[in-house]
Amino acid sequence: NSEAALFGISELLVNGVEHGNLGLSYEEKSQLALNNCWKSEVDRRSAHPDNLGKRVRLSFRRESHQITLRIADEGRGFAWRNYLELDPRRASEPNGRGIALSRMLSFSSIHYEGCGNFAVATIAPLNCQ
């Protein structure tokens, strides 16, 4: 399902920019979203000289049995295992569900390498067609 794959890929790319390259914490994003100033803060941080050259890189490999996506950002990483499952404590928060939803709807598997700034996601055969 290309729409489901696109959802997951978009989620990982946006996370790489916001949380990785721009250093926006979960708590900061929650507050900014609740105060309707999230986009202006992302724009402000994106324009900061320290962030101008930062990139999120996506590569993929299609094989007969799966597609493997590799997404890397230039951030400090994060405790990604905390976000693989939907957490009822975050159910009413404006953010914090994207990785779990991506894992459920878009990918056969997802994990992070290194400090958490390198995601590896796979799409299984049923989703490759």
Per-region residue spans from a language model:
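Short helix-loop "hinge" at the ATP-lid/N-box region of the Bergerat-fold HATPase_c
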Residues: 16-20
